[in-house]
């Protein structure tokens, strides 16, 4: 096909489009890589483009800018491109550049077509490429895809070809000139809106320089931040305390601003600290700002005989010393509370006085050690001695302003003041007189008053009233005594010091006195001492002194700082605090904001951090704010209305500002603390911490009454008040004797639709546990054995729990959790299935995150609690229930008893011609049918397991005469038959009874059960009132299988047979009635072969004959007529054992066959037909 040169473009190429040029070169390396090379002025790196296996597209390798090259075959129906070899156009956005190459219908894509693609622009244009010389002409398969529509292309436009690629190499210089023109136009159109990344150019590799920052993406180093990839994301190291600060004892702390070591609590006298740690240097290397401590060496001469210089502790480096380097030296004896001395090779500090909390530790040399280091100890001046003496006397007397060293000394001194107030004469009237007296309030009859009443003169009455009013007015910092009538002042009752306690008495006392006879009225005898106003004032001073002594240490702070509002109890503390504000100007550095003084630059810098984020105290009632809390407290008084504060939002009233502030903060503040686990938010961080306990698994608070655990202490307190309230317990005890009248809430039709039913109340339940709870609450006298539904097995799902970090699989979530904690520490645990929330619309299934898979269901017998009616699927859960609900029985051995029905099985009869019908219960049929369908392989009977077969021959009478007969209950070991005449199948279980099976006979155990059976052939159908056929207490005999083939002299005929097939592992379900056992048979016919061996007839009584037979039944599915040859061949395979032969050889064996057919009626019940073939 010839190429038309000089054909115009399909789309006109504008100037602005010509600037964005690119060249696509094919790299002849196996025909798999193409390369797009941009012009130099575009400042773009080269991109390698790799096409896919079908050669239909190319994908860029570069991650920052993707380039996709699509190669499409042209539809053959479009004659537009028949004369053009190729058409290429570009579509470009911010991150993707798409180059589409169009091929004629008859042309295939090969390496020659990818040689050069030049002039590709944003607008589509045509390009003509002639085949290049045979360079990698390996043909690429191009699928016949339909050509995608191209914007701007008109179907009527004629596409002419461009110059051939052969001429491209010859005219390369012309192309370079065109590229230069395009670059010039691009620079003119540039409006300066390009980002820095567009102007970024790759730098040449730099040599190693420790000051350069390495960028792995650029594979180069930069002087600072990488201009293309930006700054790194640093994670700083965790700060570590120095050795000196980390070794500080817990009872001490270092002041951040002043330095020095202070006590957190009271440290008693004679407490030792140490030893001191630090480097040893010469004296000339010591610094003056620290105490100088010298170490006494064991020998002044070293091993070489040279004289050793004295060594001192250098205490200036925190990384080499311990906390004792921060203890500052004392300037005088008043400040000193530690002594330094050497003991052995170490230096210790010992307290010489009691150190109070927040008191600085200051040390000086001991007397002998000071002489060793050539220092003097601090002498005690008279002023210091006086101050020390006053400090030791912490018990002042406010009557005479004396101070004492102990409370005992103060009490003895107060007794001397009491002697001056000896104006009361005490009496001893106990048992001295027989006159009846009426005493004051608070004294019961028979007890004398503590003090006598006094007559107070009228001139002193007014003075006493004034003194009483002064007594009631105490300091505002002290407590308020409202009930002054019952107070005691230094042995004096207040009621006896007021006017109301005079001889006049109260109105009640006057009335009682008037009712007494005149000879029984006692009049108090006044002494010569009279309570004067001076005595009252003295008593007031004693009372005030005692009360002020009790509360002054905690509440009374008379010395207040005018700058910050902080108050102190002693003036010395205030003076020490004022020095922090720089009042004296002794500090070299002062804060410009608060004028607080500091001794070091680091202390001032730490202080300035508080001003950067200084707190402001805002009023909750108005927009005003304060920088100090005491100013806010003084301000909020203006918002008091009628003695109460009102909430500005809900208008709730409070008597205290603290209460209204807590109310506003809790209910009307912005909730900025968001819970990360749920959507709740809180206004305070402490409330969020309390809420986070809801999402944790820890329950640290245990109720001592019921054993319930809680995550929070307030929830435990609320539980105790609500559940264990004495009133509630009394009401609960009163309710136990009264039972509510039960009214059925369901109709009879709804009742029949439930799986679990209470037949007494005619009530249905959806789950087993609901029925168990109902029976234990409403019918505690009813036994579980009486409810057939509760004896059915429990069907629970079986899951596999996968470890998401390895290939381990576990059967329980707890074992998987233990595995992850042990082998994958720190890994996230999968969520619990019980705590999953249902997925919302559009959300993924939450079960996918649990890494579990349902593998089937497991039917397990229920495990009953021996102390209540609860049932569980495993013994472990039952034991947990006993420990929680029956702790008094938790230490006793637990015996698990599975429920067994005691109902006698129904007896099946046969008349010889027609089968007898047994109709099963609808509920039990449904339950056992579902059970048989959901059995897993774990509960299938293994080969060689023992099975259980029950049968009852029906007694038949002839002429009114009955003869008893011993029928055998045999436990037969069942295995697959190996006979070539029988088909081999797996062992049959309850879910596989519909399959054809063959059985072999093995060693059996024979147990004898006596029932009555007629001897005559008359066919009548009276049932034997028997009991459940279960292994009796008699000793079983071992019978060899060969005995079953021994000929017998008697044959049993016309007897109905009942059989049951249950795995021996289900011991708890033996003893089911026949309708439960028979209903598990699917629809079909089953043959029972009966082999009877006769025994000598033993006379039992008149008219009765006792015969012992050995009968064996083999269950097999078959036709209506049993093949006698197969039965005889089975009998010939066994060899008789003479040791076990109990019958003569002349007895002939006879086999009787029974056919069991199960059908289903229209009403859903099952019927069992037993007949002879």
Curated annotation (Swiss-Prot):
Q: Where is this region: C-terminal glutamine-rich region?
A: 926-1153
Q: What CDD domains does the record point to? A: PR-SET_PRDM10
In what ranges is there compositional bias, type Low complexity?
1150-1160
Q: Any S-S bridges, and between which cysteines? A: none
Q: Does the keyword Cell division apply?
A: no
The biased composition feature labelled Basic residues covers 430-447
Keyword annotations from UniProtKB, A to Z: Activator, DNA-binding, Metal-binding, Nucleus, Repeat, Transcription, Transcription regulation, Zinc, Zinc-finger
List the signal peptide residues: none
Residues annotated as domain SET: 248-366
Q: Name one GO biological process term.
A: positive regulation of DNA-templated transcription
Major localisation: nucleus
A single Gene Ontology CC term: nucleus
Cite the SMART domains for this sequence. Answer: ZnF_C2H2
Q: Where is this region: Disordered?
A: 146-211, 430-451, 1014-1056, 1125-1173
According to the UniProt entry, its GO molecular function terms are:
DNA binding; DNA-binding transcription factor activity; methyltransferase activity; zinc ion binding
Region (N-terminal PR domain) location: 267-371
Polar residues composition bias: which ranges? 154-167, 1161-1173
Q: Name one Pfam family in it.
A: PRDM2_PR
Q: What is known of its domains?
A: The SET domain is degenerated, suggesting that it has lost methyltransferase activity.
Function per UniProt: Transcriptional activator, essential for early embryonic development and survival of embryonic stem cells (ESCs). Supports cell growth and survival during early development by transcriptionally activating the expression of the translation initiation factor EIF3B, to sustain global translation. Activates the transcription of FLNC.
Family (UniProt): Belongs to the class V-like SAM-binding methyltransferase superfamily.
What is the recorded name of this protein? PR domain zinc finger protein 10
């Amino acid at each position: 096909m010839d190429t038309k040169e000089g054909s115009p473009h399909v789309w006109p190429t504008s100037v602005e489009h010509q600037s964005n040029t690119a060249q696509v070169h094919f790299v002849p390396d196996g025909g798999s890589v193409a390369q797009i090379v941009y012009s130099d002025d575009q400042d773009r790196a080269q991109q390698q483009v790799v096409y896919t296996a079908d050669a239909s597209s190319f994908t860029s390798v570069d991650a920052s800018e993707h380039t996709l090259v699509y190669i499409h075959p042209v539809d053959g129906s479009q004659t537009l491109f028949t004369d053009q070899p190729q058409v290429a156009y570009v579509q470009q956005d911010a991150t993707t550049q798409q180059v589409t190459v169009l091929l004629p219908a008859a042309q295939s894509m090969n390496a020659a077509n990818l040689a050069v693609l030049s002039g590709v622009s944003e607008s589509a244009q045509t390009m003509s490429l002639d085949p290049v010389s045979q360079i990698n002409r390996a043909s690429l398969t191009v699928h016949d895809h339909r050509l995608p529509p191209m914007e701007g292309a008109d179907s009527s436009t004629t596409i002419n070809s461009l110059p051939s690629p052969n001429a491209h190499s010859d005219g390369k210089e012309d192309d370079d000139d065109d590229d230069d023109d395009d670059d010039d136009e691009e620079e003119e159109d540039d409006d300066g809106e390009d980002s820095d990344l567009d102007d970024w150019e790759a730098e040449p590799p730099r040599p190693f320089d420790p000051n350069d920052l390495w960028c792995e993406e650029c594979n180069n180093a930069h002087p600072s931040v990488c201009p293309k990839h930006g700054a790194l994301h640093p994670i700083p190291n965790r700060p570590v305390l120095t050795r000196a600060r980390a070794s500080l004892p817990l009872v001490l702390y270092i002041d951040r601003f002043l330095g020095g070591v202070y006590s957190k609590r009271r440290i008693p006298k004679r407490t030792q600290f140490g030893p001191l740690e630090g480097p040893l240097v010469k004296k000339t290397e010591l610094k003056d700002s620290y105490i100088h401590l010298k170490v006494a060496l064991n020998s002044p001469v070293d091993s070489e005989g040279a004289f050793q210089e004295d060594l001192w502790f250098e205490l200036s480096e925190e990384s080499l010393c311990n906390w004792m380097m921060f203890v500052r030296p004392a300037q005088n004896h008043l400040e000193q509370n530690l002594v330094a001395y050497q003991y052995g090779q170490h230096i210790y500090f010992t307290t010489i006085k009691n150190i109070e909390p927040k008191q600085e530790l200051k040390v000086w040399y001991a007397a002998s050690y000071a002489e060793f280091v050539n220092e003097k100890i601090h002498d005690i001046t008279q002023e210091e001695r006086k101050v020390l003496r006053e400090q030791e006397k912490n018990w002042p007397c406010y009557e005479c302003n004396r101070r004492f060293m102990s409370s005992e000394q103060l009490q003895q001194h107060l007794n001397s003041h009491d002697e001056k107030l000896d104006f009361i004469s005490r009496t001893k009237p106990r048992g001295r007189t027989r006159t009846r007296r009426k005493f004051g309030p608070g004294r019961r009859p028979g007890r004398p008053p503590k003090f006598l009443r006094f007559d107070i003169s009228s001139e002193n009455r007014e003075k006493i009233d004034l003194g009483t009013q002064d007594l009631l007015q105490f300091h505002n910092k002290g407590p308020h005594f409202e009930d002054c009538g019952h107070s005691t002042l230094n042995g004096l009752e207040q009621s006896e010091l007021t006017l109301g306690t005079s001889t006049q008495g109260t109105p009640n006392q006057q009335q009682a006195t008037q009712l007494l006879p005149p000879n029984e009225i006692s009049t108090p005898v006044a002494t010569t001492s009279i309570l004067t106003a001076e005595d009252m004032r003295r008593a007031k001073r004693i009372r005030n002194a005692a009360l002020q002594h009790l509360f002054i240490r905690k509440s009374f702070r008379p010395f207040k700082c005018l700058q910050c509002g902080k108050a102190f109890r002693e003036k010395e503390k205030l003076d020490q605090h004022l020095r922090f504000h720089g009042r004296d100007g002794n500090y070299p550095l002062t804060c410009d904001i608060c004028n607080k003084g500091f001794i070091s630059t680091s202390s001032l810098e730490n202080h300035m951090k508080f001003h950067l984020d200084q707190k402001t105290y805002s009023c909750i009632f108005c927009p005003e704010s304060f920088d100090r809390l005491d100013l806010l407290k003084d301000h909020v008084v203006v918002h008091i209305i009628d003695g109460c504060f009102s909430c500005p939002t809900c208008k709730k009233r409070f008597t205290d500002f603290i209460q209204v502030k807590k109310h506003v903060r809790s209910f009307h503040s912005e909730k900025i603390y968001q819970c990360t686990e749920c959507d709740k938010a809180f206004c305070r961080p402490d409330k969020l911490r309390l809420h986070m306990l809801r999402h944790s698994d820890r329950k640290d608070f245990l109720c001592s009454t019921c054993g319930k655990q809680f995550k929070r202490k307030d929830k435990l307190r609320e539980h105790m008040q609500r559940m264990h309230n004495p009133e509630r317990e009394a009401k609960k005890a009163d309710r136990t004797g009264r039972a509510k009248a039960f009214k059925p809430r369901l109709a009879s039709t709804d009742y029949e639709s439930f799986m679990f039913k209470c037949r007494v109340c005619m009530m249905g339940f959806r789950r087993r546990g609901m029925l168990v709870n109902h029976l234990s609450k409403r019918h505690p006298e009813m036994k579980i054995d009486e409810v057939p539904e509760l004896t059915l097995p429990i069907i629970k799902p079986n899951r596999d729990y996968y470890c998401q970090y390895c290939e381990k699989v576990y059967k329980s979530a707890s074992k998987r959790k233990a595995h992850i904690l042990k082998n994958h520490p720190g890994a996230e645990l999968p969520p619990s299935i019980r705590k999953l929330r249902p997925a919302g619309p559009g959300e993924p299934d939450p079960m996918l995150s649990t890494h579990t898979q349902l593998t089937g269901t497991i039917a397990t017998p229920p495990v009953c609690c021996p102390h209540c009616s609860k049932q569980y699927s495993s013994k472990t859960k039952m034991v947990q229930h006993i420990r929680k609900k029956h702790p008094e029985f938790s230490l006793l051995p637990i015996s698990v008893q599975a429920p067994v029905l005691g109902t006698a099985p129904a007896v099946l009869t046969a008349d010889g011609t027609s089968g007898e019908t047994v109709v099963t219960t609808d509920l039990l049929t449904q339950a056992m049918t579902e059970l048989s369908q959901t059995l897993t392989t774990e509960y299938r009977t293994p080969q060689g397991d023992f099975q259980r077969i029950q049968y009852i021959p029906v007694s038949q009478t002839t002429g009114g005469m009955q003869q008893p007969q011993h029928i055998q209950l045999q436990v037969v070991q069942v295995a697959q038959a190996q006979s070539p005449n029988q088909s081999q199948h797996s062992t049959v279980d309850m879910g596989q009874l519909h399959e054809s099976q063959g059985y072999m006979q093995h060693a059996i155990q024979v147990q004898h059960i006596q029932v009555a059976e007629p001897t005559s052939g008359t066919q009548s159908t009276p049932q034997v009132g028997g009991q459940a056929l279960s292994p009796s207490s008699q000793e079983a005999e071992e019978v060899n299988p060969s005995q079953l083939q021994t000929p017998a002299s008697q044959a049993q005929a016309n007897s109905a047979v009942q059989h049951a097939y249950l795995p021996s592992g289900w011991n708890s379900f033996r003893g089911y009635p026949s309708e439960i056992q028979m209903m598990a048979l699917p629809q079909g016919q089953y043959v029972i072969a009966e082999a009877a061996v006769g025994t000598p007839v033993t006379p039992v009584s008149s008219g009765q004959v006792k015969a012992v037979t050995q009968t064996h039944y083999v269950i097999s599915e078959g036709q209506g007529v049993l093949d006698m040859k197969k039965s005889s061949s089975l009998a010939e395979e066994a060899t008789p054992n003479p040791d076990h032969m109990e019958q003569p050889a002349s007895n002939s064996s006879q086999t009787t066959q029974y056919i069991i057919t199960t059908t289903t009626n229209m009403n859903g019940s099952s019927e069992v037909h037993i007949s002879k073939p």
